[in-house]
């Protein structure tokens, strides 16, 4: 068989990154981008939540301070003293404070009734299906009641509701308690409201500064992400180029080995077949295809050119008579 004796001095072949390495590097870059994006979104959401929470607290503090100021002004006003006689039970009530008056007036007329009689009217109407509450004096239908209070009018409406029977006095106390809770929000440490507001303002300023810093960091991360995306694009182009080269090199590596083996007609047929099989296996063990491909890489290493490689090896074995 012909042998190549010019391939004695070989240099190290040029090593290129494999497709698997490029894919792994690309996946690592994408995972890094996704992790940075998630961390950035979580930090921004946390900062926005803290800023909103501080703003709500400041608004609540402002409302509480305003309500306290209004209640203080109301308490400092002179007490209005007057007497009132209920038109139903004829009991006389005297007003000696600026709290909610203990009597109600229908919104449809000007007749006043004590709170106890109004609750009795509502209770009687609730016990009768499809009944309405009317003024006992003018028989005008009453849908809502109003309670007089200095500088304010409180309007209330009764609804039918299944519940345990509560004495009218207790109902009156419960409603007064609800009105007081709605009119004034309880505040702890009233003397330190100003200090708390200043502290909240300082915290908000610090959070805004931190938010600005996070935005700058976000811009930097976005710039790094763009660089990583460009790097990924470049790696994708390299992968496509290598895939194209692989598709181009695959047909070029085809090596045709034609083996022509004679036979001795005088020998038994099984001996001829055994000889032919051993020759085929010996030729395949010579690695002719791999050797030619190694020579091709050595010659064209480091260049984009690639020569076609089509080698025909003819092996003739004659039999001596």
Swiss-Prot record:
Protein function: Plays some regulatory role in both viral DNA replication and transcriptional transactivation.
Superkingdom of origin: Viruses
Protein name as catalogued: Major immediate early protein
Keywords, in A-Z order: DNA replication, DNA-binding, Early protein, Host nucleus, Metal-binding, Transcription, Transcription regulation, Viral DNA replication, Zinc, Zinc-finger
Broad class of where this protein is predominantly found: host cell
Region of interest (Leucine-zipper), ranges: 228-249
Alphabetized Pfam families for the sequence: zf-C3HC4
Record-linked SUPFAM superfamilies: RING/U-box
């Amino acid at each position: 068989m012909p042998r190549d004796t010019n391939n004695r001095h070989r240099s190290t072949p040029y090593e290129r990154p494999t497709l698997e390495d490029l894919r792994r590097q690309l996946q690592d870059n994408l995972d890094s981008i996704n992790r940075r994006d998630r961390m950035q979104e979580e930090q921004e959401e946390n900062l926005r939540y803290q800023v909103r929470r501080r703003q709500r607290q400041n608004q609540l503090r402002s409302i509480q301070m305003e309500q306290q100021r209004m209640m203080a002004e109301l308490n400092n006003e002179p007490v209005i003293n007057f007497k009132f006689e209920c038109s139903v039970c004829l009991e006389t009530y005297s007003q000696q404070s600026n709290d909610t008056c203990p009597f109600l007036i229908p919104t449809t007329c000007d007749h006043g009734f004590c709170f106890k009689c109004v609750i009795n009217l509502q209770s009687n109407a609730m016990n009768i299906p499809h009944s309405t509450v009317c003024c006992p004096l003018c028989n005008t239908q009453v849908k809502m009641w109003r309670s007089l209070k200095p500088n304010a009018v409180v309007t209330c409406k009764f609804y039918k509701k299944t519940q345990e029977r509560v004495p009218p006095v207790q109902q009156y106390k419960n409603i007064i308690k609800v009105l007081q809770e709605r009119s004034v929000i309880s505040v702890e440490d009233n003397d330190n409201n100003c200090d708390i507001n200043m502290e909240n303002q300082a915290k908000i300023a610090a959070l805004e500064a931190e938010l600005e810093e996070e935005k700058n960091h976000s811009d930097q991360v976005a710039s790094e992400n763009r660089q990583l995306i460009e790097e990924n694009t470049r790696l994708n182009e390299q992968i496509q180029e290598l895939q194209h080269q692989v598709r181009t090199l695959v047909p070029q590596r085809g090596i045709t080995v034609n083996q022509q083996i004679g036979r001795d007609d005088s020998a038994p047929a099984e001996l001829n077949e055994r000889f032919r099989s051993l020759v085929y296996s010996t030729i395949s063990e010579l690695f002719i295809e791999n050797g030619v491909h190694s020579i091709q890489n050595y010659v064209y290493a480091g260049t984009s050119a690639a020569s076609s490689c089509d080698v025909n090896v003819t092996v003739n074995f004659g039999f001596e008579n």
